[in-house]
Swiss-Prot record:
Cleavable signal peptide: none
Keyword Protein biosynthesis: no
The protein, known as: Cell division protein FtsZ
Entries under Gene3D superfamilies matching the protein: Tubulin/FtsZ, C-terminal domain, Tubulin/FtsZ, GTPase domain
Record's keyword terms, sorted: Cell cycle, Cell division, Cytoplasm, GTP-binding, Nucleotide-binding, Septation
Family the entry assigns: Belongs to the FtsZ family.
Length: 394
């Protein structure tokens, strides 16, 4: 179902809270990039690390418990530190309509304190979104186990959760990419999501979206996908939509999403046909009965560029794809093409795949051969054609 939302746009208050070393670093990089209409808060048990934060609000938690020396990679200490400093956290969150809590899972402060911070934010009535990373495989089993427990705690505390496995950074960078540049790629998922929502609710459009629309799609929805796609030139709408729904860093693909908030921003040349093209790409990739709320904004400064922002939620719980190399919605052009990628999106591709045994009939083999030629066609386009074919046969 495609809904058009029109009316007055109320400006909501957005706050981004970085918890622990990883969360603090993410906040610093977002501040360096430059963002408007967002308040940044840094929370840590390590007083020395907190001094390096560029956030306007800094909270040292668990001063009595840790004496400012950190959580020692113990999530239980991180949790108790946040509980000790609950009042300070509440004061910092006060007045927020939406709170992003970002942290690295696997250590002490981020893993233990971030779920407590998120729970406080949600209890105070803020729409609460978690953006967390899983540790690299080489960091060891103990850290992976702690991270898994932290992710589950975050799921229980937030409205929606976005998980970025650090191992996937290895798929989108080459061997010569500096480490800090690689981490910026992960931070971009958070930055683009926050920037996209900020723009959605702060800029009035021809077909308008407001904070109520964001809440409709993101409240109590579990896993989420947030993405922004930018393109220009021929097929710009289609290309921007593809980029928005295909981040190789995320554990969740858009396949099966039951709720989608989509905004298209373009110059005065943005046409109705282009808006329809972009919406079709997103709608066909999501669930057949998706609740899709759609908005457009005309920004003359963009000239030939189109920006597509997508927030997708309402996924059925699926086994974690932590061990898989990258998500796939049929695109992922930034991913190393030599890798063998598979994700939740590929579940819909299985009926088209060429994995057949030698005992199959010649008809099956012919079908496999035909499918192989179409391997470069995005799965959701093939799904769309299949649905249309079924409707025609009826």
């Amino acid at each position: 179902m495609l809904e058009f939302e029109q009316g007055f746009n109320h400006l909501a208050t957005l706050k981004v809270i970085g918890v622990g070393g990883g969360g603090n670093n993410a906040v610093n990089r977002m501040i360096d990039h430059g963002m408007n209409n967002v308040e940044f808060i840094a929370i840590n048990t390590d007083g020395q690390a907190l001094n390096l934060s560029k956030a306007e609000s800094k909270i040292q938690i668990g001063e009595k418990l840790t004496r400012g020396l950190g959580a020692g990679a113990n999530p239980e200490i991180g949790k108790k530190a946040a509980e000790e400093s609950r009042e300070q956290i509440e004061d910092a969150i006060q007045g927020a309509d939406m709170v992003f809590v970002t942290a690295g899972m696997g250590g002490g402060t981020g893993t233990g304190a971030a779920p407590v911070v998120a729970k406080i934010a949600k209890e105070m009535g803020a729409l609460t979104v978690g953006v967390v990373t899983r540790p690299f495989g080489f960091e060891g089993r103990k850290r992976q186990t702690q991270a898994a427990a932290g992710v589950e705690s975050m799921k229980a505390a937030v409205d929606t959760l976005i998980v970025i496995p650090n191992d996937r950074l290895l798929d989108i960078v080459d061997k010569s990419t500096p480490m800090m540049e690689a981490f910026k790629e992960a931070d971009n998922v958070l930055r683009q999501g926050v920037q996209g929502i900020s723009d959605l609710i702060a800029v009035s459009g021809e077909v308008n979206l407001d904070f109520a629309d964001v809440k409709t799609i993101m409240s109590n929805q579990g896993s989420a996908l947030m993405g922004i796609g930018v393109s220009s030139g021929e097929n710009r709408a289609v290309e921007a939509a593809k980029k928005a729904i295909s981040s190789p860093l995320l554990e969740t693909s858009i396949v099966g999403a039951q709720g989608v908030l989509m905004n298209i921003t373009g110059g005065e040349s943005l046409s109705l046909f282009e808006a329809q093209e972009a919406a079709d790409i997103v709608q066909d990739a999501a669930d057949e009965d998706v609740n899709m709320i759609f908005g457009t904004v005309i920004n003359p400064e963009l000239q030939d560029e189109i920006v597509v922002t997508v927030i997708a939620t309402g996924f059925e719980d699926k086994p974690s794809s932590q061990g898989r190399k990258a998500t796939s919605t049929g695109f992922g052009s930034s991913v190393n093409s030599s890798s063998n990628h598979q994700s939740g999106a590929s579940a819909k591709e299985d009926s088209f795949s060429a994995h057949t045994s030698h005992s199959q009939s010649s008809e099956s083999v012919n079908e496999r051969s035909h499918t192989t030629k179409d391997d470069d066609i995005p799965s959701f386009i093939r799904n769309r054609e299949e649905r249309r074919s079924r409707r025609t046969r009826r």
